[in-house]
């Protein structure tokens, strides 16, 4: 069982994609240091998060089926430190978080550390708006002055 699990939950638009890219590209080097980043494909943690949270996502939920269980199994079988990272985990419900902790071996002695990356609100709001516009094509909003 992993001794320590670093569970990076985002939040969105805080450099998470860059961090995940660095972790994914450096899996062999991390493994040499005893650190597991369990991913055979770049979006493995995204699919696992969709599965854990049972989120619909444009048909990807069928690809996601069983992904969290597989990721958690690999973490439990690893002896050392494991890292899991995806920003949609920041919106997990209390029940989803409890299920994640249990499946990662928290009740059996694994140390699970939740890592939260944040951004100052002045930059976060426009970044979220821009991301929503990119995904949906258009977005209108009325802002009231105070």
Feature locations, PLM:
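PAPS-dependent sulfotransferase catalytic core
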Residues: 1-82, 86-88
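PAPS-dependent sulfotransferase catalytic domain
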Residues: 29, 94-141
